[in-house]
């Protein structure tokens, strides 16, 4: 088995993945959402301290699941990039300690690659080549994945990420963090879902394949300010619905532009923001239009987790891509290449 560790942001997670058939044997996770909610976003120093507290607790649960028999573990895998430096280092320190004390090889894994492999948790075979939309609090990307060592970034956001824009809109409406499920609930509760959109679709006439949410976010801010003295539930629902609809339509329009160029046969959607049901439905319709198979990450493995890191690290294990402890380090940025 591979013991994998994830601590790139505000989720502490450990998992055990069986090498022979890629079966997820155990998955443990502690979310920090309630600790960051009052701040409207993740506070790195708080996240780091909580990882230092939570990771040892999760390791104890791993010990119990193994009956304290670590002989079944053949490698340690850790997310080392991209992410918050102060949280990545907490996971790396645990991984190094386990690697040294158990005399096991160490695998460094890219967090974005891990999200791609969340599509294949519990599956021995992957479905590559495929194209992937990654939407989360930190990223809005289209990726092309040909194999483990050949994953390229085709499109990215020029400013805010998809998930980050939901967080900021929720904060404008004084509704808390994380904003994704809050804004989604507003949209679901809105009583007039078929009216024309009140916010502009970003980059609608731009020839560039990219994402942008800052203009849409600013349009929401102006609407909130206009209704400052009458920001009741119905107004909040209306803003939430129209913002979400415009944000998803932007993703659809840009991805459709990509589809017309590349005509992918398989398209995956991953990342924490991919739990949004309206987004999933919109992409079901888009993929049906282009006769493209849609593959969705399971809802429980959309947000950051060690199970996806365990699944991706199986590929590294087979290729013996091990890193000496003295060379193991972290990076706040991904090393995945931009498409050339």
UniProtKB/Swiss-Prot annotation:
SUPFAM superfamilies given in the database record: Actin-like ATPase domain
Keywords for this protein: Acyltransferase, Cytoplasm, Iron, Metal-binding, Transferase, tRNA processing
Listed EC numbers: 2.3.1.234
Free-text comment on the cofactor: Binds 1 Fe(2+) ion per subunit.
Annotated positions binding substrate: 134-138, 167, 180, 276
GO terms, biological process: tRNA threonylcarbamoyladenosine modification
Catalytic activity: L-threonylcarbamoyladenylate + adenosine(37) in tRNA = N(6)-L-threonylcarbamoyladenosine(37) in tRNA + AMP + H(+)
Cofactor: Fe(2+)
Pfam families for the chain: TsaD
Molecular function terms from GO: iron ion binding; N(6)-L-threonylcarbamoyladenine synthase activity
Protein name (database record): tRNA N6-adenosine threonylcarbamoyltransferase
Organism for this UniProt entry: Helicobacter pylori (strain J99 / ATCC 700824)
Gene field: tsaD
